[in-house]
């Protein structure tokens, strides 16, 4: 029989050119053999055959333009016939008999035989590795009783002691740092927001629309400008909850929280500032067009927008490392008595793909060792990076949880939204959580690119128990099951718990959907990150999805939407930010100038050394020593040493001004009798970074920008060349 090989769904490769024919008429080919090569303006791809057989005709030629559904070749295939003939007659009869019996049972609504044959498999999977289910049940019941009687802390202590005892007895089985693939905070412990959720959703929707419109308008004018829609679409709720309830601005009475915004989400911050009245429409239309005054930078950077952005967060990996050292520097100043402890927080927003950058995770150990409970990471796990899934065959949330828990961080997972709560409460057999644990990110991504029927089949259909769990739900209900990062209630509870944590840094790992709300144009598809343009149908869908009050003509014009100044939305935005001290992001300074040292402070360096040679490092030490003698400058001097003080003759600073250590010195150093003894103290002035040039540079940036971020001028000095 003749099979037609058509152009499959090839994503962006629409109306593209055939640049190479890889088969010819009469040629025998196998399934998956490449047939033609097509090429767009960005890349090329081969199209494979999905049949085996002989090529009857080639229906395209080099130079032709093809799209999905176009005929490429005809293949003479006897595959179906040979497969049919290979089935023995008696086997075919058995198959027909089985099908007939199955139909009979279905008609009579008697599924007992199917259940009886499948039930042993399910029990075997669920009880895998359990040689004594009764004993297991007794242990679990005992643990539940402890939690009920004495609370979570007692249960945690007993489990820790059991693990220690197992190790002492030689049971050195690797212990996982992972918890089940569910939310960290139980429903009954969630702190509820006092905000108006209806107004907050309307505000969030308008910000989403204006952010997307800004990027689309810019690229309609100049297609080469670029920009990103999908990142902020996935993180809008994460930012909105922080803006409305948690992030306190800097003013003349309070130092303010410090927020490191994820670089690719910048359009969302501009869109919010537009509603706040801090940016106008002309400025939005200058997105990525900084050649003109008032243009908005592609990404956060204080050099480009010195009154707006506080921190640079692109290239990837800069944000997390700089945030860690910023939080440490804040603690350093508090412990030295230079600033008050106001309970300020440093928040850093990161992407799950960004966490592959070595700098993203390279300093998390320091954050735990220094007990930086003023630091909160929020990792937006939309499961996608630029080209595809972050961990298609794995689970990035579980991976990050293990890494951060292992390093000593407080981890809060926000995976499932509120619509999942009843299902999890009714998961008496544990099969729902089991399915959640087993499903890999590639599957989760694909599900959100499909529909409710697909999720019912591919996710809930894995076990009879999970299938039964949603038997009363429609496909629409299943599709409505939301992810935690898009649920303001779950996000609020996580932020509240993170803000109150003491003794360790916190990471909130939130599961979201890249391109959330973009529909077919970009929701949970691999090309989302590159989406800069939306056609009219996409824009109409986006408007309807988020109930943006624009007419069809206004949508076609890609107009921004800003409510009247007296509208409930604008009033609410302003009221929330007034209560939190002002607007964010905003870059200002309240630093007082430092009195300059006297002119003669360096007189001793003007005198010739005669025949005595002096290295540059020697001169530097002398210069710093002179500055440390000045009562105005000395407290503001921050020597930053990446582990080579002794190499360059700077060990004298150890005793003179001390090495900063947040816990002081718990030991007597072996050189305690020496003048240059290694003296650590809580009020120490030297930042001894170890063999860590990136960390030293991060500390230098924190100190060098303290005039604006901490309202205190410092003289920071990396004491050896970096690079």
Question: What name fits each language-model region?
Answer:
Residues 1-37, 46, 50-52:
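Acidic, low-complexity mobile loops and tails
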Residues 12, 23, 40, 60, ...:
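Short, conserved catalytic or interaction motifs in soluble domains
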Residues 30-48, 67-83:
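Short hydrophobic beta/alpha edge segments that flank linear recognition/processing sites
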Residues 78-97:
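Intrinsically disordered, low-complexity mixed-charge segments
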Residues 85, 97, 102-241, 349-350, ...:
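Conserved acidic/glycine
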Residues 195-207, 211-222, 228-370, 393-394, ...:
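Cofactor-binding active-site loop characterized by glycine-rich and histidine/acidic residues
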Residues 255-257, 344-345, 373, 503-505, ...:
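Short coil/turn segments at beta-strand junctions that form active-site/ligand-binding loops
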Residues 713-723:
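Single conserved hydrophobic/aromatic residue that forms the stacking wall/gate
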């Amino acid at each position: 029989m003749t099979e037609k090989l058509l152009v499959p769904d090839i994503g962006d490769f629409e109306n593209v050119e055939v640049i190479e024919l890889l088969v010819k008429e009469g040629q025998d080919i196998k399934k998956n053999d490449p047939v033609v090569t097509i090429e767009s303006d960005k890349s090329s791809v081969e199209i494979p055959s999905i049949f085996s057989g002989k090529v009857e005709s080639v229906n395209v030629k080099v130079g032709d333009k093809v799209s999905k559904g176009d005929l490429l070749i005809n293949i003479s295939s006897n595959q179906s016939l040979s497969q049919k003939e290979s089935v023995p007659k008696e086997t075919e009869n058995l198959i027909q008999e089985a099908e007939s019996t199955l139909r009979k049972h279905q008609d009579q609504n008697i599924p007992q035989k199917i259940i009886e044959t499948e039930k042993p498999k399910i029990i075997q999977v669920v009880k895998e590795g359990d040689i004594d289910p009764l004993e297991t049940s007794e242990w679990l019941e005992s643990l539940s009783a402890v939690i009920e009687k004495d609370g979570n802390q007692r249960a945690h202590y007993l489990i820790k002691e059991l693990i220690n005892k197992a190790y002492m007895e030689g049971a050195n089985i690797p212990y996982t740092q992972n918890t089940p693939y569910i939310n960290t905070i139980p429903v009954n412990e969630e702190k509820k927001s006092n905000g108006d959720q209806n107004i907050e959703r309307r505000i969030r929707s308008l910000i989403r629309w204006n952010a997307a419109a800004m990027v689309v308008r810019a690229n309609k004018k100049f297609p080469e400008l670029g920009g990103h829609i999908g990142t902020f679409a996935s993180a809008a709720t994460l930012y909105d909850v922080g803006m409305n309830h948690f992030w306190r601005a800097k003013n003349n009475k309070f130092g303010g929280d410090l927020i490191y915004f994820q670089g690719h989400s910048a359009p969302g911050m501009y869109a919010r500032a537009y509603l706040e009245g801090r940016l106008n429409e002309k400025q939005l239309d200058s997105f990525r067009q900084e050649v003109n005054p008032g243009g908005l930078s592609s990404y956060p950077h204080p050099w480009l927008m010195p009154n707006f952005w506080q921190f640079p967060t692109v290239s990837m990996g800069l944000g997390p490392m700089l945030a860690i050292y910023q939080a440490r520097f804040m603690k350093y100043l508090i412990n030295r008595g230079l600033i008050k402890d106001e309970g300020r927080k440093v928040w850093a927003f990161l992407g799950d793909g960004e966490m592959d950058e070595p700098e993203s995770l390279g300093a998390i150990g320091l954050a735990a060792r220094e007990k930086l409970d003023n630091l909160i990471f929020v990792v937006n796990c939309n499961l996608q990076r630029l080209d595809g899934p972050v961990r298609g065959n794995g689970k990035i949330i579980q991976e990050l949880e293990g890494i951060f828990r292992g390093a000593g961080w407080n981890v809060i997972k926000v995976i499932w939204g509120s619509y999942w709560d009843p299902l999890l409460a009714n998961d008496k057999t544990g099969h729902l959580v089991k399915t959640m644990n087993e499903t890999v990110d590639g599957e989760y991504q694909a599900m959100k690119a499909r529909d409710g029927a697909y999720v019912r089949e591919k996710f809930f259909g894995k076990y009879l128990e999970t299938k039964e769990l949603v038997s009363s739900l429609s496909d629409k209900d299943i599709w409505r099951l939301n992810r935690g990062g898009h649920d303001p209630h779950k996000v609020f509870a996580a932020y509240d718990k993170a803000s109150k944590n003491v003794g360790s840094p916190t990471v909130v790992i939130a599961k979201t959907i890249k391109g959330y709300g973009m529909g077919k144009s970009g929701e949970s598809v691999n090309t989302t990150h590159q989406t800069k343009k939306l056609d009219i149908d996409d824009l109409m869908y986006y408007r309807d999805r988020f109930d943006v009050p624009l007419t069809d003509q206004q949508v076609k014009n890609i107009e921004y939407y800003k409510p009247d100044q007296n509208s409930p939305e604008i009033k609410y935005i302003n009221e929330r930010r007034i209560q939190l001290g002002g607007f964010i992001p905003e870059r200002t300074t309240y630093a007082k100038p430092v009195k300059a040292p006297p002119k003669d402070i360096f007189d001793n360096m003007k005198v010739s050394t005669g025949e005595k040679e002096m290295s540059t490092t020697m001169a530097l030490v002398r210069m710093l020593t002179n500055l440390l003698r000045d009562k105005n400058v000395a407290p503001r001097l921050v020597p930053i040493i990446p582990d080579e003080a002794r190499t360059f003759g700077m060990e004298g600073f150890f005793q003179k001004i001390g090495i900063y250590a947040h816990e002081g010195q718990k030991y007597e150093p072996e050189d305690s009798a020496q003048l240059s003894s290694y003296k650590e103290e809580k009020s120490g002035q030297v930042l001894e970074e170890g063999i860590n040039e990136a960390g030293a540079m991060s500390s230098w940036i924190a100190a060098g920008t303290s005039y604006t971020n901490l309202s205190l001028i410092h003289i920071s000095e990396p004491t050896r060349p970096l690079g």
